């Protein structure tokens, strides 16, 4: 081999020996045995410095701490800070504490205001409902009392007006609010002819039956004890509502009426 350069005729620098590549992986592991193994994720978190707790964590921790209630917020805050060993606060720390206390007071005031407002609204609603119910009851009681008084009036005109008021029917009246005892008193005060008219109207319009054969029975009024007397008055007040509210009773009364007819001898008219 030529050991001199062509141009300068100076000797060439020595060529380093070429190292053969390592083909056995075991040899490589042996060479790296003295290096530290990489840490897994859990180990890295373990050796890392702990992170600072968040504000939520601190708040949750303080919620579990004992505190003396019944004192102003600043007194309770100072007592709690003294228990933690934070006696000397900087101006910035005091400002942060003041912001927290003020926000707590505002939240408490808002909650109290919302609760009080809801209580007032509910109370007003209940009072209005009770007042409306009492007004309706008094109005209907006054109407029944007026009708009762007119039925006992010596004036024929007054009695006729009372009967017209009973049989006319006021569809705007809520019969569920009427006093049953008051309606029964009205029935007792009515004359016999007026009662017969009320019964005939009830049988034909409410039970929807033909009472012609029934009237042929001697003492037919004695066989109507399955109909409460206040039903005649209530049906005259609001027949549409009566048919809806007392539909089951109407079905039972119609069946009872048919049983009475089937047990009595039929009379040819």
From Swiss-Prot:
Keywords: Chaperone, Host cytoplasm, Phosphoprotein, Viral RNA replication, Virion. Residues 1-27 are annotated as: Disordered. This is Phosphoprotein. Belongs to the nucleorhabdovirus protein P family. The keyword DNA damage does not apply. It is found in: Virion; Host cytoplasm. Residues 1-10 have a biased composition (Basic residues). Phosphorylated by host kinases. Its main location: virion. Non catalytic polymerase cofactor and regulatory protein that plays a role in viral transcription and replication. Stabilizes the RNA polymerase L to the N-RNA template and binds the soluble protein N, preventing it from encapsidating non-genomic RNA. Homotrimer when phosphorylated. This trimer is stabilized by binding to the L protein. Binds soluble protein N, and ribonucleocapsid. GO terms for cellular component: host cell cytoplasm; virion component.
């Amino acid at each position: 081999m030529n050991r001199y350069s062509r141009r300068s005729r100076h000797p060439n620098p020595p060529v380093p020996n070429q190292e053969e590549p390592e083909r056995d992986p075991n040899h490589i592991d042996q060479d790296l045995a003295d290096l530290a193994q990489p840490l897994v994720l859990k180990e890295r978190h373990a050796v890392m410095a702990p992170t600072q707790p968040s504000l939520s964590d601190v708040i949750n921790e303080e919620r579990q701490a004992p505190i003396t209630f019944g004192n102003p917020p600043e007194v309770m805050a100072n007592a709690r800070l003294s228990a933690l060993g934070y006696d000397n606060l900087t101006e910035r720390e005091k400002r942060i504490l003041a912001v927290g206390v003020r926000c707590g007071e505002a939240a408490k005031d808002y909650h109290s205001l919302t609760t009080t407002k809801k209580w007032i609204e509910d109370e007003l609603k209940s009072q209005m409902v009770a007042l409306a119910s009492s007004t309706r009851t008094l109005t209907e009681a006054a109407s029944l009392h007026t009708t009762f008084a007119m039925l006992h009036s010596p004036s024929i005109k007054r009695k006729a007006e009372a009967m017209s008021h009973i049989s006319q029917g006021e569809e705007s009246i809520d019969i569920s609010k009427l006093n049953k005892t008051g309606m029964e008193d009205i029935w007792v005060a009515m004359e016999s002819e007026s009662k017969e008219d009320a019964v005939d109207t009830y049988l034909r319009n409410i039970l929807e039956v033909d009472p012609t054969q029934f009237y042929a029975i001697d003492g037919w009024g004695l066989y109507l004890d399955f109909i409460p007397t206040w039903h005649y008055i209530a049906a005259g007040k609001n027949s549409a509502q009566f048919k809806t509210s007392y539909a089951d009773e109407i079905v039972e009364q119609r069946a009872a009426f048919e049983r009475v007819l089937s047990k009595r001898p039929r009379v040819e008219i």
